[in-house]
Amino acid sequence: MKQPLFITFSGIDGAGKSTQIDLLCASMSAAGARVTRLSFWDDVVAFSAQRERSSHRLLKGEVGVGSPGRPVARRDKNVRSWYLNFIRSCLYLIDAVRLNIVWRQHRRRNSDVVVFDRYIYDELANLPLNNVLSRAYIRLVLKFSPIPDLPLLLDADPSLAVQRKPEYPLDFVHTNRQAYLALGKIEPSIKVIAPALIPEVQDQILKQLLALRAIKGQCPAFIAFLAASPIANSQAQTM
């Protein structure tokens, strides 16, 4: 039984992950691929509803998703203290265990591609990566966590990201972006997608997929949905 291709999308809030996931899943489905889309928060994270309620109650932040016409002042991952980092570290270990279970389940299911909206990387980027103990802990969790076939990190300009999704202070988003980039140096398999317009980001993702095809040429499902995609064919001819 052929195993599915695992693709993950990570990045700061407002980086455009949902847009690119929608576009990629739609194009792969149109090409005949059986695509499973998972939300790390909804499908992997342990006690997600309880954690959200507790965070709102204790940290007094607003709930909801921010939009240009409706800013939301969230207080959760942007609140930093040693005891919150300790609690997060404990919870992230549980999430890593859950991730392995979910990963094994979907390896055996009838899908060609499994796409994660966020991944364990998005949690680890909430920790202080400038701390030696935090980096050691992160390496431990990464060693224990499954490595996706294509882990994508969508980089973005923090100012534009906050305009698109006003939920956190700009200074925190700058700090969070640097944490993601630092995490990419700890885990070299992460592919950083440079900030750009939506079609240009699509092109960068496509190039990563085509490069992956060259490495995993033995994967029929992967080759099938790429070969059937008109966008992929035109891009391949220009590379």
What do these predicted ranges mean?
Residues K17:
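Conserved lysine of the Walker
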